[in-house]
Design a protein with these regions (language model features):
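Long, charge-patterned amphipathic alpha-helical coiled-coil/hairpin "stalk" segments used as oligomerization
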Residues: 88-193
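Flexible glycine-/small-residue-rich
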Residues: 42-44, 75, 114, 171-173, ...
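Short flexible coil/turn linkers enriched for glycine and charged/polar residues
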Residues: 65-67, 77, 162-165, 201-204, ...
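Residue-level signature of catalytic and energy-coupling elements of molecular machines
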Residues: 22, 83, 128, 210
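Generic N-terminal amphipathic, Lys/Arg-enriched alpha-helix
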Residues: 1-12
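Structural signal for hydrophobic packing residues in well-ordered secondary-structure cores
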Residues: 11, 15, 23-34, 48, ...
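Translation machinery proteins
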Residues: 19-81
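Flexible, glycine/charged-enriched surface loops at secondary-structure junctions
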Residues: 34-38, 195-207
Length: 226
């Protein structure tokens, strides 16, 4: 039996499903031999070329992402120990800037204190394409490094609109209980709704689909999310 045929027996890819149904389908369609991530694709009625509509926000998921987040904090003085005490995997300044210049980027997130940004900004060509450049909007440029580390480790996700007007984000793992995925998705949904720019006319959040890493996208009836 082909994968597409087995998927077709589980759901109709043209239909919209209530959130709980959609999650159930994603779980049934998952056949990978590892704990797949569960991903959301959210289509917004925005034009990211306009600064006001270029949405970039963060939120903490109540049940985490299920992923171990490897963090680098770029800081100086007592902020180095503060970050390490909070759980940062790596922390330093010039030594790590030099490592990044040499091509080392074996981390999931970088947090930086504001004083590190002038030097870090010079590495934009390395960090930018990988989505690793710290940004105040996402809470990764801050003096409160302990809080930032704790939030990232607990399951902070960045919600950033792409050129196509779509936000892609992880919302958990296939092994999560359905209720935990629902709570995470509602948190993402409500956070995005609150970020609606005043310039947007008509419906803001247009479409949503949910999938596992290796599975098909299932369309969600956004009216079923409250």
């Amino acid at each position: 039996m082909t994968k597409s045929k087995s998927y077709n027996e589980i759901y109709d890819n043209e239909s919209f499903y209530d959130l709980e149904q959609a999650i159930d389908i994603v779980k049934k369609a998952s056949s990978a031999k590892f704990d797949e991530s569960v991903d959301l694709a959210i289509s917004l009625n925005v034009d990211p070329r306009h600064a006001e509509e270029n949405i970039r926000i963060s939120t903490s998921l109540p049940n985490g992402t299920g992923k171990k987040v490897v963090l680098l904090v770029l800081a100086q003085g007592d902020k180095v120990q503060e970050a390490l005490d909070a759980g940062a995997d790596y922390c330093g300044n010039k030594d790590y800037l030099d490592k990044i210049k040499s091509g080392w980027v074996d981390v999931d997130k970088i947090i930086a204190t504001p004083d590190m940004m002038p030097e870090l900004g010079k590495l934009g060509k390395i960090l930018g394409p990988k989505g690793l450049m710290p940004n105040p909007k996402s809470g990764t440029v801050t003096m409160d490094v302990a809080k930032a580390v704790s939030e990232q480790k607990a399951g902070m996700v960045e919600l950033r609109v792409e050129k196509t007007g779509i936000v892609h984000t992880v919302c958990g793992k296939i092994s999560f209980e359905s209720k935990d995925l629902i709570e995470n998705i509602k948190q993402i949904y409500n956070t995005i709704l609150k970020s609606r720019p005043p310039s947007v006319k008509g419906q803001f959040l247009e479409k949503m689909s949910i999938s596992s890493s290796m599975g098909p996208g299932v369309k969600v009836n956004i009216n079923s999310i409250g």
